[in-house]
Swiss-Prot record:
Pfam families registered for this protein in UniProt: Yip1
Source organism of this protein record: Xenopus tropicalis
Keyword Membrane: yes
Signal peptide positions (record): none
Parts of the chain on the Lumenal side: 106-111, 164-180, 230-233
Keywords tagged on the record: Golgi apparatus, Membrane, Transmembrane, Transmembrane helix
Residue numbers on the Cytoplasmic membrane side: 1-84, 133-142, 202-208
Any one GO cellular component localisation term in the record: trans-Golgi network
UniProt-listed GO biological process terms: endoplasmic reticulum to Golgi vesicle-mediated transport
InterPro entries: Yip1/4-like, Yip1_dom
Bilayer disposition of the protein: Multi-pass membrane protein
Annotated protein name in UniProt: Protein YIPF6
UniProt keyword annotation of Plastid present: no
Family: Belongs to the YIP1 family.
Amino acid sequence: MAETEGFGDSGSKQLFAGLSNVSISGDIPVEGEITVPMASTSQEDDLSTLDEPVKDTIMRDLKAVGNKFLHVMYPKKSTTLLRDWDLWGPLVLCVSLALMLQGGNADSKDDGGPQFAEVFVIIWFGAVVITLNSKLLGGTISFFQSLCVLGYCILPLTVAMLVCRLVLLLSHTTASFIVRLVVVTVMFAWSTFASTAFLADSQPPNRRALAVYPIFLFYFVISWMVLTFNTVS
């Protein structure tokens, strides 16, 4: 054992003998940083809403919905609707449009119940069908991103419905119908253009027409419902 320990000590001395004359000059600064950056942790803390007041959370969500409304009214190639998707805005627009379509001649006997259900089902079922068609054609966006865009782009038609109701309160003449026709046509084109501006780039170039055509039909059906609405006389 003593011989083994002596052999080990001599081997260690020979191994580190060459390092005994190595020195670091005082003129050469030794630089470096051994601290671990905490940027990712701070970002996660900023995004956490566990300690955030409910009022701040609601105001932030309302601001996000308002920003998406602006993107629809001024459509351009942007990823805001796709990146920060939500279904609160589409739900509000769908309910608002269905409520404004109540009270027409077609559903006066039923007190507007079926009309509300028709609008609600047409909008959401149509959006789901368009989304599935987009995915089957090779679209690159997710299911809920497509629903978000299609739902938010109902905003122009909701505005058209509001204008049509105001016009019908004034008169039921041919001139009022022409005004409603112009408003609905413009808003229909606006909704179609806005939705395709967000969704067209997510489709393969040779299949974009197949993806845009159902969107055209979707907003055309909603526009027809808005145009043919007539209050109870």
